[in-house]
């Protein structure tokens, strides 16, 4: 393996956007002497991580999955949200073979069509317009028993904003003449990604048996009761919605179960609980044999029909480094480990040759405002050791704090999170200086720079569409304006003196002065 004289580290500060408005801007109010010094001393600018620049609809806020796919692939990758919305607009969705087969089989067997997913206009993990299209398609194909299991958001949307969505779907089912909302539960339970199976089991029992902490005859009533219990959308307890006869919905042999989330990372655990025969995350009271369909590909080992299989991305940064005989390291905490590996590699699970991975466990706390530094110290310990080992040409690291603490809506905690990351960056930059290394500091999307909704006054827990920082800690250089996340991989190759493959349509942003 060849080694560069200057190993390059890419530090991705998750959820770290730039915002002129300083009100409730945790990044602005944090004491960040390291980043202040680097911005004063080195070339820096701002790049785009949202909307059309990352393959999302115009104006759509960025997110971690999308951000890392663009960062790692070096091209604008049209995201599942855009792709599926286009299929609906073009009337291709209603003819999708995987979806049609599942619905038709359930109808033929006299069974029900169960549709589950994040009922939200957030567009990060799902979109309620896709769920509506699925409900319409099921009824159009003859399904009379259509049950919607709604996971509530409050994270990529305002904390208490689900009422409009639930009311809309109540009206939709009335218009269609068939179907109803069968259950509601917060995404905190249904969409865990950190092996907290006690949470997922509550969603599983709710969907399979209608077993819930609470029962109501209407979804909006259930939501209002949750608010009375001081539960925001994300944390709504399992609530079964009964029909006119007081009965709950249950999942039975021969039914269809269609998962309408298009983002993989928070869809995997609950999917495995439904389809893996050897599943051992929790004890399942029932294991109905259903026609399970995933909207997109969640993981290579999840064996279920996929409505929209992944598009194959070749010559991503990781693959190019492998093919050029270079070494690389991917490192992050549990919460963003999939992002610096699976997503950064264009949806490939297996590491490339010469690619090492280090996973640091995220702290076991209910919400990260309780420990805003998360595991950043341990992460940095490992990262500094890796730099000093001089084993790697390229190091990709994600610090999750800005995003994970930003999502809690806790301003003071978000400030502490930013300060913790700043201190860690100082250690990383010092370690790189000792070995003649350089680094690019950027982000995948914004979050912590806006901690309150200026209109409603509610906590702002979602991502933003703000530009993100782009700092080059290295040789004297200039940085082009108007960059985007897909320019980062070509920039790294350019700094290494490597040719940029044709598949990478991004452009190098950093130009070293001779």
UniProtKB/Swiss-Prot annotation:
It is an enzyme of class 5 (isomerase). Mn(2+) 1 binds at residues 403, 407, 463. Keywords: Glycolysis, Isomerase, Manganese, Metal-binding. One of its GO terms (cellular component) is cytosol. Pfam families: iPGM_N, Metalloenzyme. Substrate binds at residues 125, 155-156, 187, 193, 263-266, 336. CDD domains: iPGM. Pathway: Carbohydrate degradation; glycolysis; pyruvate from D-glyceraldehyde 3-phosphate: step 3/5. Mn(2+) 2 binds at residues 14, 64, 444-445. It comes from the Bacteria. One of its GO terms (biological process) is glycolytic process. Its EC number is 5.4.2.12. The active site is at residue 64. Its cofactor is Mn(2+). Binds 2 manganese ions per subunit. GO terms for molecular function: manganese ion binding; phosphoglycerate mutase activity. It catalyses: (2R)-2-phosphoglycerate = (2R)-3-phosphoglycerate. HAMAP family: GpmI (MF_01038). Monomer. Belongs to the BPG-independent phosphoglycerate mutase family. This is 2,3-bisphosphoglycerate-independent phosphoglycerate mutase. It comes from Shewanella sp. (strain MR-7). The gene is gpmI.
């Amino acid at each position: 393996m060849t080694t560069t004289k200057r190993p390059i580290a890419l530090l991705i500060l998750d959820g770290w956007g730039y915002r002129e408005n300083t009100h409730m801007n945790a990044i602005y109010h944090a004491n960040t002497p390291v980043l202040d010094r680097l911005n004063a001393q080195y070339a820096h600018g701002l790049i785009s991580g949202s909307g059309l620049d990352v393959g999302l609809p115009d104006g759509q806020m960025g997110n971690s999955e999308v951000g890392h796919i663009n960062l790692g692939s070096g091209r604008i990758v049209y995201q599942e949200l855009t792709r599926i919305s286009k299929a609906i607009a073009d009337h291709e969705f209603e003819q999708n073979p995987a979806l049609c087969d599942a619905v038709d089989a359930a109808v033929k067997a006299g069974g029900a069509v169960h549709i589950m997913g994040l009922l939200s206009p957030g567009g990060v993990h799902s979109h309620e317009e896709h769920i509506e299209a699925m409900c319409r398609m099921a009824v159009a194909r003859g399904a009379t028993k259509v049950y919607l299991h709604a996971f509530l958001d409050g994270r990529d949307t305002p904390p208490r904003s689900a009422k409009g969505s639930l009311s809309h779907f109540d009206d939709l089912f009335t218009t269609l003449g068939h179907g109803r909302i069968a259950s509601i539960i917060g995404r905190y339970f249904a969409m865990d990604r950190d092996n907290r199976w006690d949470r997922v089991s509550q969603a599983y029992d709710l969907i399979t048996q209608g077993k819930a902490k609470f029962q109501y005859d209407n979804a909006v009533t259930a939501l209002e009761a949750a608010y009375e219990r001081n539960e925001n959308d994300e944390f709504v307890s399992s609530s079964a919605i009964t029909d006119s006869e007081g009965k709950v919905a249950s999942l039975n042999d021969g039914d269809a179960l269609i998962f309408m989330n298009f983002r993989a990372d928070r869809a995997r655990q609950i999917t495995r609980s439904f389809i893996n025969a050897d599943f051992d995350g929790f004890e399942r009271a029932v294991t109905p044999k259903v026609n399970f369909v995933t909207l997109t590909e969640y993981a290579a080992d999840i064996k279920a029909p996929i409505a929209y299989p992944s598009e194959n991305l070749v010559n991503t940064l990781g693959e190019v480094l492998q093919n050029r005989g270079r070494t690389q390291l991917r490192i992050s905490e549990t919460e963003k480990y999939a992002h610096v590996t699976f997503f950064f590699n264009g949806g490939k699970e297996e590491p490339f040759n010469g690619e090492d991975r280090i996973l640091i466990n995220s702290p076991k706390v209910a919400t990260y405002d309780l420990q805003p530094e998360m595991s950043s110290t341990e992460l940095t310990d490992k990262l500094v050791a890796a730099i000093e080992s001089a084993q790697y040409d390229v190091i990709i690291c994600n610090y999750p704090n800005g995003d994970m603490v930003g999502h809690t809506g806790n301003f003071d905690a978000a400030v502490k999170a930013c300060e913790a990351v700043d201190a860690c960056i100082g250690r990383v930059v010092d370690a790189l200086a000792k070995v003649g290394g350089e680094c690019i500091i950027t982000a995948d999307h914004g979050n912590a720079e806006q901690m309150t909704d200026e209109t409603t006054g509610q906590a702002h827990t979602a991502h933003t569409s703000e530009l993100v920082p782009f700092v080059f800690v290295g040789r004297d250089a200039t940085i082009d304006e108007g960059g985007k996340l897909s320019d980062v991989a070509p920039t790294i190759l350019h700094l290494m003196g490597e040719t940029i493959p044709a598949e990478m349509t991004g452009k190098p942003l950093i130009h070293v002065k001779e």
